Amino acid sequence: MNNPVIVDCIRTPMGRSKGGVFKNKRAEDLSAHLMKGLLDRNPAVDPASIDDIYWGCVQQTLEQGFNVARNAALLAGIPHSVPAVTVNRLCGSSMQALHDAARAIMTGAGDTYLIGGVEHMGHVPMTHGNDFHPGLATSIAQAAGSMGLTAEYLATLHGISREQQDEFAYRSHQRAQAATVEGRFRREILAMEGHAADGSLILVEDDEVIRPETTVEGLSKLRPVFNPASGTVTAGTSSALSDGASAMLVMSEAKAKELGLPIRARIKAMAVAGCDPSIMGYGPVPASKKALAQAGITIDDLGVVELNEAFAAQSLPVMKDLGLMDVVDEKVNLNGGAIALGHPLGCSGSRISTSLIHLMEDKNVRYGLATMCIGLGQGIATVFERVQD
């Protein structure tokens, strides 16, 4: 069986969804920029040799509709002979795109794939056009369709306090800001043009979403947004709304070596799992356990972990039940997470995987885990193994 490997991985800066730097850029622009960027950075790869493009996106309508993957590929100037498909597993879409490419390589269907994902939440809101079947009320709780209420329920079940959530959100912003100031994001961000508040053209090199002025005291004053009467989840402890894309060049190990390309990491194991939709944020626990078992390693073998921070109220129970609470500051979301950077739905799976691989290199560790929850009760996880000299 062929080994799927990561040759390169990049992302755009994360822009604020409300009047942010990408307000005049479309989802296809963000995606095409990264597709072109990966090929420019790896000239040994003949664009015509790409077997397929898998691109995650959740709200596949308006500018993100009609197979945004193909639209972006055409915009990027990729040969017309190269196919492209848009993948949707809600929040896990671009990680699913990675899994699809990895399996294609493992089965010998191809050697070279571009994968990634995008979401322009400023142009296509998360709830745009949503229309749940009324019959779902007979099999799941009515509130299961509200991600914020599922986070509230998870916090209640696991005894997660408002104070713990505020502390975790503060940590996310502080770590993301430190990573920005110290240049730790520079290797994973591919700068691109955007627009300042006055409409002038600028080069966007850093994430716009991080709020370095965040304090625990300030967070403590915010009102609960999903359950105003007795809730604990606030806008400040939820993932920020942002616009962004991420991308990876995935190849068979044999093809990468043949072309003399660097092998950044091997895909060691992949898993998805379901859980009660009422606690959708718990999905990373069964998915991660499944992936670790497939990899033949334990949670203690992991050097770094990237957990998508949908909500602090969701992240804390996951870390608790995965046995990570005692090593959070040594292993988990070391450069902050989605509370600070945002969670552009279709982008996040390959975004956290990209951040993870760069951290694995920085920390010189062998194994890393990227995992995330998925709306309506799913989780997805990938174990990466760094190729060490």
Curated annotation (Swiss-Prot):
Top-level taxon in the UniProt lineage: Bacteria
Substrates-to-products reaction catalysed: an acyl-CoA + acetyl-CoA = a 3-oxoacyl-CoA + CoA
Main enzyme class: transferase
Gene Ontology CC annotations of this record: cytoplasm
Listed InterPro entries: FadA (IPR012805), Thiolase (IPR002155), Thiolase-like (IPR016039), Thiolase-like_sf_Thiolase (IPR050215), Thiolase_acyl_enz_int_AS (IPR020615), Thiolase_AS (IPR020610), Thiolase_C (IPR020617), Thiolase_CS (IPR020613)
Active site: C91 (acyl-thioester intermediate), H343 (proton acceptor), C373 (proton acceptor)
Subcellular location, principal: cytoplasm
Family to which the UniProt record says this protein belongs: Belongs to the thiolase-like superfamily. Thiolase family.
Subunit structure as annotated in this protein's UniProt entry: Heterotetramer of two alpha chains (FadB) and two beta chains (FadA).
HAMAP family: FadA (MF_01620)
Role summary: Catalyzes the final step of fatty acid oxidation in which acetyl-CoA is released and the CoA ester of a fatty acid two carbons shorter is formed.
Protein known as: 3-ketoacyl-CoA thiolase
Upper lineage: Bacteria, Pseudomonadati, Pseudomonadota, Gammaproteobacteria, Alteromonadales
Gene name as annotated: fadA
